[in-house]
Amino acid sequence: MHIRSFISKSWANSWPMTLIMFFEFLIGMTDIYIAGRVGKEVQATYGFVVQFYFIFIIIANALSMGTVSVVSRLFTAGDKAALAKTVWSVIITTATVGAVFSVAGIFATHWFMEFINIPVGLKQYGTQLGKIYACGLVFHYLLVSTNGILRSCKMIRSSLLTMAIVCLMNIGLNFIIVFHTRLGFWGIALSTVISVFAGSIVNLWHCRAFMNKARAFSFSVVRNVISIGWPGGATQAMWQVHSMVMFLILSSLPEKSIEILAALAAGIRIESAIFLPAIAFNMANAVIVGNLIGEGKKKDAYRGGLVTMFMGTGIVLLLTVIVIASARWIAPLLSNNETVVAETIRYLYISMLSEPFMALWVILGGGLSGAGDTRSIMFNVIAGIWLVRIPLSYICVVLLGLSAASVWWTMNLSQLIMAVFMTRRYWQRKWLM
């Protein structure tokens, strides 16, 4: 394939995913904006509860990762019977697991909030938000899974339409419920539940095109999907748990711990303007590489992954410059507390320096995922997060008593290390064998 063909194929998959991630960004920004207007306690609690919530989403993301790898290859190989069996099996499995975790989340939230070491003033807010979010887990599971199916089968624009609906509903309901009903801050979580329910129904309707009347369920298909997806799930689990550990480490700061936590929540939401496009190119790369491998074009799969990485990293670099230039204007929009605003700006100025490295390893990781090489991604995260970021952050804050800025610099170092390891793995091409 000519380089222009790679660029065209990459962009055809990447721009809808970028818009989808932009919708996710708008939802997150709206959540943190509304939480900040309610109060710094709610804003800090929201930042923690969302990390807790997405720990439960990990299984869905793992299944989706395995689904994309399997379905993208089956779709281009032209095996309609195997494709139909895979789609049906994945949907049934996802719905079942999602329902189990919804129930578990509802009953476990109160216990977890009592057990975890966070400021006492945040526990009540966390319990209420957590239980509401748990109610929507089963629908979120279906939404994630069916989005993966649609983009694997070259119906990414249908997925884009669904997420546009989810975005509009989530944002609109957020403002209405929080500010115009007695439910108050509950609306932050309730708007998510309602919108993902609607999105899952729309996507299930689209997925009918890939299912036959037999509705055959296959345990072997599920095992195959899980075997590819579980390292991805483990990777996301380690990432989410690491976020909670970082939250606890920062809670140990002797001064301004709540303000720092609120600033981190706000900073991450602003940073997601950069991170989510990288994830969009990651997901697009998984489909591109998977489709090309399904066609038997391994050399093209390798080159297509590189082209997608360079495109995505270039966009991330541009967005990084924009965020740095506008940080002092954006941060006050998310909080009316002067200390939170100042710490948010400090976080952005430091963390932005490593964004191109983040984009590089995340997007190349998408290509590896599409080929089914999810274990190397897992080992990369273990090295960067659990052997570098967490230990050094603990040493800086707990043992040495340094400020939060030391943690931000430690995060930059870990991004660089992960970029080096992922580039080396991709360049070796062992994942194509």
Question: Which sequence ranges carry the predicted segments?
Answer:
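Helix-terminus/linker motif at the lipid-water interface of multi-pass membrane proteins
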Residues: L26-A44, M113-V120, I176-R182, Q240-I268, ...
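Transmembrane helical elements of multi-pass membrane transporters/channels
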Residues: A12-D31, I132, L143, V166, ...
